[in-house]
């Protein structure tokens, strides 16, 4: 599986570079906790995470602690030695939710901090992911083949608004996807009074599975 992933990743990166070099040049990185985690590609031993406590700088799990005893384990490992495209490390973040038998939780999320200054300067966004589900052989639950991406904005006065509600398709094989936010949609976010920005991946709420995330990057469309 890992060999197949390396081959697929190399083919995808080569394909993108070949067909759209100008488009890639028009984007620059926006710092996020998850992006930094993948850039460093440092291993994380399997750990049972505490809700809303960082397991890496700027990265944490959101867990519904009011309904049942939902939990999650995370780990990270290098896929191979050396660096990936664009100077990035090559690593895999594994997120394994554990669900209560009786009560369905309201949410299980993977969350990351986003550089607010860079977000406010961006004319548009592109959010790149490579991910797949590893579903246990004995799983009997219906697991949606997607995760939902949201941008949560904390505003002055304590107001919080959620945006995007974008479904990222996730298969059982590594799949690359780009979510795009154009200039018009960026204007509608009204970022002037925003004090904090988070990107949130909402995971399926049932089943025996592990979300495998091999790449995460937020890119800003240059105004020029």
Name each model feature, range by range.
Residues 76, 105, 109-112:
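Membrane-lipid interaction segments
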Residues 80-107, 171:
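Short carbohydrate-recognition loop motifs
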Residues 156-192:
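Extracellular carbohydrate recognition and processing domains
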